[in-house]
Amino acid sequence: MAIDLKKHKSRRIILTKQGKRTERHIPVLLQPVLAGLIPLVGAKVIDGTFGAGGYTRALLNAGAQVIALDRDPHAIREGQSLVDEFFPRLRLVQGNFSQLDCVVEEKVDAVILDIGVSSMQLDEAERGFSFQKDGPLDMRMAQTGFTAADVVNRLKSDELARIFKILGEERYARRIARMIEKRRCVQPFLRTGDLAHAIEVLVGRKSGERIHPATRVFQALRIYVNDEIGELARGLFAAERVLKPGGRLGVVSFHSLEDRMVKRFFSARSGESVRSRYLPEIEMAPATFFPLFKGGITANKEELERNPRSRSARLRIGVRTEAECLFADMKLFGLAKIASFEGGKK
């Protein structure tokens, strides 16, 4: 079935409660997502990362029934108008997508996961996700638990360095961690702009350099605060449990660490052996997925021009087989261990 994407694109301009015009979130790789999950008419789909509702709206416009989850209470509040608009085909649930198998009573036709921070969260300075706008050093998606400020002001430098190195793939992880530990003794880091500036002064920035030197540190802190790696791993296993045979799992990731996890999952679940320096070779098991589009799908030139945030996005899709679910072993991903925040509390 062909999809007329002009009908299903999210509207770009909306009115806020104050009557001001604002731009609606543009979901990345929307066309490949819709094409990869078809047929959608009457399909039961889980959108595990509702965010600003871009994918959910497009899925609903294509005729699907959607259960959408998000751990961010702000996203849930903002999404109520969409629930009213598409009642009864949309159910909105506050919760982590790692628990998506707890919100459905029967198998579903598709699951879509858009990993990482949403544009809505990035654009709100008070949420503290971005250094583009100064705000409190927060970064909590669910708005509960410890903040990024707690992490940088309490963890030892070697623990910080490990977080920056593993979760942010930051080459200057140790230097930055030592600087943070030394500086916070005089004045704690409480603002995004303060931390970003301190990193820029330490590392330096060449004229015309596109990527800010604090980018990878902010990425690492956000991933750590929200346990995004654990969430992704558990979410992949949960999707395996809820998809019916022939059902499709689509995952959009934005950096190499997440993409490697998704790739390893589909490789292992398709019957391929997986190698890692962290664990012995995993024996082949009955395939529960077969992946589509080897190497994944990235944004084309047109989308890159329209939505620069799609630059680093990659979509991977797997089709569920009839095989029984396999054991949910976190070792499959070959991840190095990082200390929990409990050791950093006063």
Curated annotation (Swiss-Prot):
Positions annotated to bind S-adenosyl-L-methionine: 53-55, 70, 97, 114, 121
Keywords: Cytoplasm, Methyltransferase, rRNA processing, S-adenosyl-L-methionine, Transferase
One Pfam family it belongs to: Methyltransf_5
Keyword Kinase: no
GO biological process: rRNA base methylation
Localization: Cytoplasm
Superkingdom, natural source: Bacteria
One CC-aspect GO term: cytoplasm
Reaction(s) catalysed by this chain's protein: cytidine(1402) in 16S rRNA + S-adenosyl-L-methionine = N(4)-methylcytidine(1402) in 16S rRNA + S-adenosyl-L-homocysteine + H(+)
Keyword Plastid tagged: no
Enzyme Commission number(s) from the entry: 2.1.1.199
Alphabetized SUPFAM superfamilies for the sequence: Putative methyltransferase TM0872, insert domain, S-adenosyl-L-methionine-dependent methyltransferases
Single GO molecular function: rRNA (cytosine-N4-)-methyltransferase activity
InterPro entries, A to Z: RsmH, SAM-dep_MeTrfase_MraW_recog, SAM-dependent_MTases_sf
Cited function: Specifically methylates the N4 position of cytidine in position 1402 (C1402) of 16S rRNA.
Family label: Belongs to the methyltransferase superfamily. RsmH family.
Descriptive protein name: Ribosomal RNA small subunit methyltransferase H
Protein source organism: Bartonella henselae (strain ATCC 49882 / DSM 28221 / CCUG 30454 / Houston 1) (Rochalimaea henselae)
Gene (UniProt): rsmH
